[in-house]
Amino acid sequence: MINRKPTRIELNMEDIEEYEQLKKEQTNSYKQQQQQQQPTTISTPKQYPLLNTTQPPKKTTAQIIGYDQ
């Protein structure tokens, strides 16, 4: 393998400010979407997951190697 010097990545204050601004915008849009969806989720009944009865119970490691009989 060729030995290379590590790549140097410089981070400017402008980059940090831009990141913080984008993060705020995304969190605000996410909160707005959640608030818009909230009334619809309250009116719908809860749906419970279906039980999967077609698969046999999983064996533990001890059962697989024959330690637990």
UniProtKB/Swiss-Prot annotation:
What GO CC terms are in its UniProt record? anaphase-promoting complex
Oligomer status and interactors: The APC/C is composed of at least 13 subunits that stay tightly associated throughout the cell cycle: anapc1, anapc2, anapc3, anapc4, anapc5, anapc6, anapc7, anapc8, anapc10, anapc11, cdc20, cdc26 and cdh1.
One Pfam annotation, family name? Answer: ANAPC_CDC26
Q: Does the keyword Cell division apply?
A: yes
Q: Which InterPro entries match?
A: APC_suCDC26 (IPR018860)
Q: Which residues form a coiled coil?
A: 8-38
What name does this protein carry? Anaphase-promoting complex subunit cdc26
User: Is-annotated flag, keyword Chaperone?
Assistant: no
Stretch list, region Disordered: 23-69
Question: What is the protein's known function?
Answer: Component of the anaphase promoting complex/cyclosome (APC/C), a cell cycle-regulated E3 ubiquitin-protein ligase complex that controls progression through mitosis and the G1 phase of the cell cycle.
Q: Which cysteines are joined by disulfide bonds?
A: none
Q: Identify the taxonomic lineage of the organism of origin.
A: Eukaryota, Amoebozoa, Evosea, Eumycetozoa, Dictyostelia
**Keywords on this record?**
Cell cycle, Cell division, Coiled coil, Mitosis, Nucleus, Ubl conjugation pathway
Task: Give the main location.
Answer: nucleus
Q: Please name the GO terms of the biological process aspect recorded for this protein, alphabetically.
A: anaphase-promoting complex-dependent catabolic process; cell division; protein K11-linked ubiquitination; regulation of mitotic cell cycle
